[in-house]
């Protein structure tokens, strides 16, 4: 919307300046005219050649957008509506509005305009009507008001004459002041609407930021820490061996340990005491060849088995 408003402003300002600069007004005519009750009055205005084929009309009101049409040229160069007629002279680039049998109610603000796209070109004419007892012109005469622009052709009066001491004021006019005010008001409304829309969008973004403060904080931290850091890494490669070395085989010795099934008891048996005494006296023991050493083995009887030697 902001871009749309910025795009609309320059052409509008240029259009307004075009109507305010002297010499750029497309229509010229009298700013005020005076007529007499019961008589006829002609109002002539002149237009530029580029509006030669456009429709011309005469309306009552001070605002062109709300002006009430009285008479308008259609397919022909002349049209009539009651006591008011309009005639378009395309050769001289003028059109004349004739008001017949004037009354006091005819006094007011009128507009002479050219129908164009968008905003019509127009100028405002103040019509004054005076009672018939005030001599303005000789009876039965018709007065015609003409335009004498500096940059266009000049046309003199064709019927009657303007009495001495009575002067008509001709002022070039563009868009009337109410039209300009309405255009400015429209642009102001457009600007206010654009500002409100931008404010609403800003409020929505603020509400979303308040709902997710952690996310906003993380985004801020990420933006603060967005500086790039670089580290140089050096990789050392090991030289390849020609042949892979097979893993060394460790010799393993296995041994089986078995518990004895029976407990062994050993007993020393001494056969005579004399030998013990001789040993005590220091005599070396002697052993007869006939004597043999006997060994005995004592086993613990098993449970449930009877002794074989009672």
Curated annotation (Swiss-Prot):
Basic and acidic residues compositional bias, start-end: 291-310
Segments passing through the bilayer: 179-199
Membrane-side (Cytoplasmic) residue stretches: 200-310
First-listed, main subcellular location of the protein, grouped into a coarse class: membrane
Alphabetical UniProt keywords: Cell membrane, Disulfide bond, Glycoprotein, Immunity, Immunoglobulin domain, Membrane, Phosphoprotein, Receptor, Signal, Transmembrane, Transmembrane helix
Post-translational note: Phosphorylated on tyrosine.
Highest taxon above the source species: Eukaryota
Compositionally biased region (Polar residues): 136-161, 271-280
Signal peptide per UniProt: 1-26
Entry-linked SMART domains: IG (SM00409)
Residue intervals on the Extracellular side: 27-178
Region ranges (Disordered): 136-168, 271-310
Ig-like V-type domain location: 27-128
Pfam families: SIT (PF15330), V-set (PF07686)
Membrane-related topology note: Single-pass type I membrane protein
GO biological process: establishment of localization in cell; intracellular signal transduction; mast cell degranulation; negative regulation of B cell proliferation; negative regulation of B cell receptor signaling pathway; negative regulation of eosinophil activation; negative regulation of eosinophil migration; negative regulation of fibroblast proliferation
Residue pairs linked by disulfide bridges in the UniProt entry: 45-112
UniProt GO MF annotations: phosphatase binding; phosphatidylethanolamine binding; phosphatidylserine binding; signaling receptor activity; transmembrane signaling receptor activity
Glycosylation sites: 42, 92, 101
Cellular component per GO, a single term: membrane
Compartment list: Cell membrane
Phosphotyrosine sites (modified residues): 295
Assembly information from the UniProt record: Upon tyrosine-phosphorylation, interacts with PTN6/SHP-1 and PTPN11/SHP-2 and INPP5D.
Stated role: Inhibitory receptor which may contribute to the down-regulation of cytolytic activity in natural killer (NK) cells, and to the down-regulation of mast cell degranulation. Negatively regulates the Toll-like receptor (TLR) signaling mediated by MYD88 but not TRIF through activation of PTPN6.
Similarity-based family: Belongs to the CD300 family.
Protein name: CMRF35-like molecule 8
Organism: Rattus norvegicus
Encoding gene (name): Cd300a
